Each structure stands twice: as structure tokens, then as C-alpha cells.
């Protein structure tokens, strides 16, 4: 693709692109980010769980009922009884035996089947109220509440991460587009010099070697321009996907820099130690460990439960009510060991908190120093930019006067594009370092405030 064709395609793309300021891009990302949506859903799920166990330990009232029908058969063997009846007469006095022999005694059947069948129904209402469970219900509620706080910390961390990702892709697209524009301008200018060198060769002003050097420089400029074009296209796709745009996106907020130092290091360390979601997550983990320990201790205490049940029927209904007490005196499980283990988990969480505070403070300091270094680097490159511009002017005048060659001018313009690109890269380094610093301090939402404070815009 030639320079003219690329310029036409870029113009068409800009006309159809969605123009977004950084704040607009952030709002769009927050509304459409699947990562943030997943984090919010996780928080809502934990909050619902916490709400679900809010009344844990209260009374439980239930109603039960049954209906039944039965049919029962019992088969009786009467042969032994018949035999006994037959033997009764021989054991009586002779006078009675004669009388009985004249009276017919009925014979029982060999067997007889008894049948019982009936239908019925029963209903009752029951209530159970744990009066004291040793603190187990409070431990469960506290554990679920701590899980909700952990999910909230994860959601806050996800918010900081997507903010930093947006800065990377938004201003990365700005940098890539600026680099492509500078490389395109260099390609156009060097193309003109290449054409002029061809005419100078035909006129015998320069040698064939000088002509080939100009052609090689032009080919290198073309390769650099095409690479920068592809990089800009890829950066644009990444930005569009981040903000969930159907087509391309044109960033409207330029790379920026605050020439004066920002707040001191202590400001960001203090903010990090109170706002960093990583510390909130560690605190939630510690609370969970504490509640697990309380749950273990609750199993060592007595449990008192009130209960009652009553038949649902009119008249004289059956009912029962009472109190139940349970206290485990001996258990095959070593409760002391389990209690010590849960206490160790609390100690582990405390140590993790101390380590996290140290790591976060170090991370904040590293990012703060990287930001200040990027600021200094950008400001110090001003001399390099001015030098590159002056060299281009000098080589242009020298070419007219015959004191410079076409290759000298091409080298000067190539170097100018390189220096301008490097300075834009330094501005992007500053912006990315600022985003990293704010994320590590838990202040990502204040990024736009620093855009408003910027006194240097890299257009």
C-alpha cells in the first residue's frame, strides 16, 4: 500500500470512526465490561447469601401431615386347637363323657384368616428454636459477611485493573497513530527526495551509488511506515474491543504530561494503605479465619434448644413441648488441635497483611519513581527534538547550496521522525506510569483529574 492509498484509507476510517474522549471511553467500558459485570454479580451473590443467613438461629416453624390406608391379614392355624378339643373329653369323668358323646361338638376349620383394614389422616405443627448454640450462628453470619467483603474487594481490584487496561489501550492507540503519522510523513518526504535523486542521477549531478543509497533509504522508510500502520491498526482494534465498539475508535484525548512533579510519595503510600483493595481482601480473609475459629470454639460449648409439636385437630389434641440440652463431653476429634489450627490461620492472615502492606508500599514507590523518571525524560528530550529540527533545516539549505547530499537530508528527516516518535513514547511512558501509580494507590478513578491538570499535550 502506497503513502497516498494509506492516507485515503485513514481518512475514510476517521470519518466512520467513533470519536471518544477518555472519560467517554471509560464510561462506555464501565457499562459494557464483562469483567466488571462478573465482579458485580459475584458481589451481589455474596450479599444475597449474607442476607439469607441474617436470621440464622431464629425459630423454625413447620407443618406436617400424612394420610394413610392399610390392609392387614393374619392367617391362624386351628389344627392344634381342634386336637386339644378332641382330647378334652377323655380327661372328663365317665358320666360327663357319656353326656358329651351324645352332644355333637362342632368341628373348627383347619385355619382362619383375620383381616383388618382402615384409612386415616394426621397433621401437626412443630417449632424448634435454638436458644443457645455457643456462638455458632454468629460465626456463620460473620463468615458469610466476610466473604461478601472479599468479593467487594475483588470487584474494586477489577475496577482498577480495567481502568489501567483502558489507559494502556487508549493512549497506546494514540501513540501508535502518532507514530504511523510521523512515519507516513517521513515516507512522503523521502519519496520526494528519492524522485529528486533520480533526476539528479539523470543530470549527472550524483553518482549511481548515491542514487542507490537514496532508494534504499526510501524502501526502509516504506517498511517503517507499513509496520507503523499495522501497529496502529492493531492498537485500534484492541481499543475498540475494550470499549465494545462495533467499528474503529478515534481517541480524542491526546497524550499528556504534567511538567511539574505531582504529589509527594507519602501521599500515595498513605492512600494505598487505606484504599488498596488488596488490603481489603486480606482483611476479609482474616475476618473469615477469625469466624472459623469462633465456629470451632462454639462446638465446645453447650447447646440449648426449645421445641414443641401439636396435632392439628379439634378437641383433645396431643401436644408436647420442652427444652433440649446437648453438651459434648468427649469427642474422638481433637478439638484442641482444630482450635489451634484455626488460630494459626488468623495469625497467617495477620502476617499476610503485614507483608502486603510492605509490598504495596514498595510498589507505590517504584511506580512513583517511574513516573517522575518518565517526566524528566520527556522534558530532557526537548533539546533532542530541537536539534533534529535544526539539522533538517541545515541539510535542506545545504542541499540547495550544494554542501549537503540528498542522503544527508534523508538521514536528517528520518532521525527527526525517530526523535519525535521517541518523545511521544516518553509521553506515553508517563501516562502509563501514572495509571500504574494510581492503581497501586487505589486511586484509579482520579486519573481524569490528572488529565485536567496537564500542561503539556502531545498532539
Question: How would you label these PLM feature ranges?
Answer:
Residues 10-26:
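Regulatory alphaC helix of protein kinase catalytic domains
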Residues 20, 50, 153, 157-271, ...:
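Periplasmic alpha-helical coiled-coil/stalk elements that build and connect Gram-negative outer-membrane
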Residues 21, 60-74, 78-157, 280-356:
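Small/polar-residue-enriched beta-strand and adjacent coil segments characteristic
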Residues 29-35, 245, 274-278:
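Short loop-to-helix capping motifs
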